[in-house]
Curated annotation (Swiss-Prot):
This is Photosystem II reaction center Psb28 protein. It is found in: Cellular thylakoid membrane. Gene3D superfamilies: Photosystem II Psb28 (2.40.30.220). Part of the photosystem II complex. NCBIfam families: PS_II_psb28. Keywords: Membrane, Photosynthesis, Photosystem II, Thylakoid. InterPro entries: Psb28_c1_sf, PSII_Psb28_class-1. The gene is psb28. Belongs to the Psb28 family. GO terms for biological process: photosynthesis. One of its GO terms (cellular component) is plasma membrane-derived thylakoid membrane.
C-alpha cells in the first residue's frame, strides 16, 4: 500500500509506514558527520497484520531511496511498542541529501521542525 506522498518511509518494500516518527538529529562539531534517530510509537510495521522480517528502513522521495539497516524494536511489558531506526551520515553530501529528504517528508506530512539551543 503506497501513498501519493512525495516522501515516505517504508519498513516493508511497497508498504508505506503511516505513523510519523519523532526525529532527532545529532552532528559533529564540524558538521560533516552525524546521525538521525527515528522513533516510531506503535508503528503499523509492528502490528499483528504485518508479516515478514524488518531488515531496514527506506526513506523514499523523488530523488530516490536512502536505506538504513540499523533498526531495533523496543518492548514494553512484553509487547513491541517502539521502533527505533538510526541513519548515520559520514560526509556533507550525505547530510545534504538526508536534509532534502527530511524537508520533503515534513512537507508531505504537514510537519515543521525546531532546534534546541
Amino acid at each position: 500500500m503506497t501513498s501519493n506522498k512525495t516522501a515516505k518511509i517504508q519498513f516493508y518494500e511497497g508498504t508505506d509506514e503511516p505513523v510519523v516518527p519523532e526525529i532527532r538529529l545529532t552532528r559533529s562539531k564540524d558538521g560533516t558527520t552525524g546521525q538521525a534517530l527515528f522513533l516510531f510509537e506503535k508503528p503499523q510495521a509492528l502490528s499483528s497484520i504485518t508479516d515478514g522480517e524488518i531488515t531496514g528502513m527506506r526513506m523514499i522521495d523523488t530523488e530516490g531511496e536512502i536505506l538504513t539497516r540499523e533498526v531495533k524494536v523496543k518492548f514494553v511489558d512484553g509487547e513491541p511498542i517502539f521502533l527505533e531506526a538510526v541513519y548515520i551520515w559520514k560526509n556533507t553530501p550525505d547530510f545534504d541529501r538526508f536534509m532534502r529528504f527530511a524537508n520533503s517528508y515534513a512537507k508531505s506530512n504537514g510537519l515543521g521542525y525546531s532546534e534546541k539551543k
